[in-house]
Amino acid sequence: MTPFAYKLPIRALWLGLLSLLLVGCQIDSEPKSELEKIRERGVLRVGTLNNPLSYYIGPDGPTGLDYELAREFAKELGVKLEMKPAYRLSSLFPALKNGEVDIIAAGLSQSEERLKDFRAGPAYYYVSQQVVYKKGDWRPRSFKQLVERQQTLLKDNPELAFFSVVDDSHFEHTLLAKQQKYPDFQFHVDSNSDVNDLLKKVSQGELLFTMADSVEVSLSQRIYPELAAAFELTEDQPISWFIRRSDDESLYALMIEFFGNLKQSGYLASLEEKYIGHIGAFDYVDTRAFIRALDTRLPRWTPLFQKYSAEFDWRLVAALAYQESHWNPYAKSPTGVRGLMMLTLPTARSVGVSDRLDPEQSIRGGVEYLRRMMERVPDSISEHEKIWFALASYNIGYGHMMDARRLTKSQGADPDSWADVKDRLPQLQQKKYFTQTRYGYARGDEARNYVENIRRYYQSIIGHLEQRQLATGDESIEDLTVIALDEEFFNEEANREILDEEAEALESESLENSESSAEPSAKPSTESKN
C-alpha cells in the first residue's frame, strides 16, 4: 500500500472535523431568541405604570392586575420577575424600544400609533375613551359642541386651562386625529402629569376637561365624586401587553398561549373580578358622604382597625365597618343589629362582645366573626376570592352563601367563582329557586350589593390615603390617618354629640345633592348575621 493510500482517510478525517467545527461555529453564531435571552438572564423585566389598577406596593407587598398577570407569566418562563414602574407614560415605550424592559404591562390600549412600532398581545379587557368634566359645570354632548364652546371661551380668556391630556398617551393620538376634522380645536399635552393628576385638576376646577379610560373614570369617581363622563370619544378598545416588533416569534407565541390558558382556566376572569368587577353604577350623593367621612370619622377609628385587623388589611375592615354603620359606634337598626360593626346579639355573644356599643369590642368582635367565616369558606375557592365569599357570609349567613354556590353549580356555572355566584345570589329571594335550597329565602340581592359596596369603599380608602400621602410627602400611609385619640372622645355623651352633628351635616348634604343627582342611591344593608 502506497503512502498516498494512508493519506486519503487521514485527509478525509481532518476535512470532516473541520466541517463539524465550522458548523458548530455557525450554530453558536446564530442569535438567541427572546425567550432564550430572558431564561438565560433569569429575570423577566416588565415595564408598568404605578397606579392602583396595574401595580403598586400595598401593605402586603406588590399588588395590581398587571402585576399578578406578570407574576404568573414569569412563573411560566421559570424566571424571577422584576417590575420596573414608570411615573410617566412617555418613558415606557422608549424603555421597551431600547431593550430596558422585555414587555409593557400597564393597562394600555391598542392605538394605531403604538401598533406601528410595537406588537400587542391578546386583549384581556376593554375600555372606551371618555371626555371628563366636573359635575355641575357645562356638559358637552358631542365633540362638535366641545369645539364650539372652546372657541367662545378662549376668545374672552386665551389663557384658560380648557383641555389637557397626558403626553404620548392614546388620548393625544385620538385628539390629533380629531384635529383633522376640527383644525381649530386646541389642547394641551402635559408631560409632567399622569391621568390621575389631570382628573384631580378637573375635580378641583383647575382644568375644564381631560380624557381618561372608562375604567379609570369609574375608579377615580370613588376618590373624586365631582368627576363625570361627558361623552365617549371612542368605541370599546382592547387593553393588552406590548413587546418589540421583530421576526422572532418566541415571546409572542408564549404570550398567546399564556393568555389562552388563563382564559380557559377561569383565572383571568377571577383576576378581572378582583380588580374591576366591583365597578358599578356611581352614586354621587353616597360617595360625597363617604369622602367626607374619610376625613371626619375614619381617623378616630384607624388605630383600632389596625390593632384588631389581624390577617386582614385594616383598610378592608374599615370598608366593612363603613358599609355596616357609616363608622357610627351607636348605629342601630330595627332588626336589632347595632354598633360600629352592626352585630346581632347572638353573634356578639359568640365572639365575646359584652357591649356592642363599645367601639373597640365591636371591631374586635366583627373581625373575629369575619375570620370564622373565612375559615369556613371551602379550600376549592382561590385565596384572593375567599374574602368575597366570607363577606357575603358575614352579611347573609354562611348557609345562604352555600345555597347560592349550590344553585350556581346546578346551573352549570362555577361555584368557586365570585363572579358566577354573585349573579345567583338574587335567586335566593325568588320562589322558583329558594324552594330548592337547604336554608330557603334570603335577601340575596342585598348580599351581592353589600359585598360590591365594600369593595368600592375599600378601593376608595386606598386611593384617598395615597392622595394624602402624595399631598404631604409622607411615605408612611398608615401614619397619615393615625391621629391621637382625645380622651374626651371616649366620653359617651361627648361622642354622641359629635356624631349627631356629623350625621345631621351628612344628611343635610345628601338631601341638597339628591335633587341634582340622577343616579340611584345605594344604601348599606343591615341584614342580620346568622
Curated annotation (Swiss-Prot):
Which species? Vibrio cholerae serotype O1 (strain ATCC 39315 / El Tor Inaba N16961)
What UniProt notes about the protein's domains is: The N-terminal domain does not have lytic activity and probably modulates enzymatic activity. The C-terminal domain is the catalytic active domain.
Question: What is the official name of this protein in its record?
Answer: Membrane-bound lytic murein transglycosylase F
Entry's Gene Ontology BP terms: cell wall macromolecule catabolic process; cell wall organization; peptidoglycan catabolic process
First-level EC class: lyase
* Database matches in InterPro entries: Lysozyme-like_dom_sf (IPR023346), MltF (IPR023703), Solute-binding_3/MltF_N (IPR001638), Transglyc_AS (IPR000189), Transglycosylase_SLT_dom_1 (IPR008258)
- Which region ranges are annotated with the description LT domain? 280-530
Q: State the source organism's domain of life.
A: Bacteria
Instruction: Report the main location listed first in the record.
Output: membrane
Keyword Calcium on entry: no
Stretch list, region Disordered: 505-530
**Which reaction does this chain catalyze?**
Exolytic cleavage of the (1->4)-beta-glycosidic linkage between N-acetylmuramic acid (MurNAc) and N-acetylglucosamine (GlcNAc) residues in peptidoglycan, from either the reducing or the non-reducing ends of the peptidoglycan chains, with concomitant formation of a 1,6-anhydrobond in the MurNAc residue
Q: Identify the stretch annotated as signal peptide in this record.
A: 1-27
A single GO CC term for this protein reads: cell outer membrane
Q: Which family does it belong to?
A: In the N-terminal section; belongs to the bacterial solute-binding protein 3 family.
Q: What does the UniProt entry say about where the protein is found?
A: Cell outer membrane
